[in-house]
Amino acid sequence: MIRRLNNLKNMKKTYLLLLFVVLFLKGFSQEQDMTLSLDQFLEIVKLNHPTIKQALNDVEMSEVKIIGARSGFEPSINGSYSEKVFGEEQYYQSFNPEVRIPTWFGIEAYGGINNLEGNKYSQSSTFGESSYVGVSIPLLKNLLMDSRRATLKQSKLFLQMSNFERDVVVNDLLMSAIESYWEYVNSYELMSVINENLANSQKRLDFIRKSYFNGEKAEIDTIEASNQYQMFSYKRNDAEIRFMKSRLNLSTFLWKNDNVPYELPQEVSPNQNWKGDLKNEKVEFILNKLLEASQVHPIVKTYELKREVLDIEKQLKFQSLLPKLDLYYNHLGKGYDVGNTLNNHRYFDDNFQTGVKFELPILLMKGRSDYKIANLKLINNDLDLIQKQNQINLKVKSYYNEYEILKRQLDLQYVIYDNYNKLVKAEEQKLMNGESSLFIVNSRQMKALDALEKLINIQAKYFKTIYAIQWSVGSLK
């Protein structure tokens, strides 16, 4: 319930954003330049995605289960009525209501009244109206741990585990969404570059054709210009298909708040603020700090809490190896007012009933089996934790090394692309001076385009890796 209230607050904070997206879907503001930033995209994902809602529901279920676990300590009212008549003779008629109050330390307090009438009844029973209060105390088995305490302790740990499991779900979902977003950005940038080159090649083809008809260019130049235009047209088709697929893939993460999926409109494009971030900011990571952060990864915390759960189970199973030795004491009173005899403080002189119950399986086969299994579960969980921690550390190191390499590649590719651009401009100048050919200019341009495409791909990988590092330490929330 608390988390749903928080969700309502989040809905207020992102109201304008959702309205913005809904307007997309309804076709409003089509004349406006509509863009979607990564932050806007992730806000929608976090607010409306069914997977996150399911994770929140799992947390709420864990909260409710604690209430169920507390029922083991809930006071109860019990009652019994019995009567026997045989051969037109009433043997007995008994009525016995009772209140029982379990306590945290295994001690159970109780009190009740009894009304026994008839002609034939057990000599150990008290005839007429009587009352009693008493306690039952475990002296060995169930003294330090019992199923009620174990269930409640474990349910509280399960709640903490469900919170960390929710963080794991959110961490994984956001990483998948981020990867899809940067693929969307990447395909859009490549399509934009190719469209720009296609438009330029169209202008060049028109210019060459006019020059050919004016006798200024050879026919071979028109063929060269036409081939380049056709090649860019082909690349544009490929780029549009890739962008369409990336847009549809991005749409799989987008949902309305009424659990209805929606598709990102074609008119929407990625926000260009990331280019400023790339130019002005350099993210720095310190490997040792990342490895320290990985120690509190939600997956690691889940296994640590699971160990506590299994340790409680082991404590409970150990109780099966102990003999059951329970002491009980009832203070009795005539009539329904047992309080009068309690005030006399003569608890073991008069008006009392006491006893001891003892039970012990001779071979303890079930107890030994259950305890051994509980211990093996703990060992397996510790082994799983070691493996998971190692896997997380290796992922952190892998993404960190990839990030460091991509930083260098990015700087190098900027230089390569800039150099190719200079070669294109120089070749175009030589063409204007009659010292080069259109074929060479086109060749230079293709190499410059290849360098730019590679630069765009590296930029997308660079941003993906930044978020992958955060994902590897479990910090995407």
Q: Regions from the language model: what does each represent?
A:
Residues 62, 73, 100-103, 111-112, ...:
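Membrane-embedded alpha-helical bundles of multi-pass transporters/translocases
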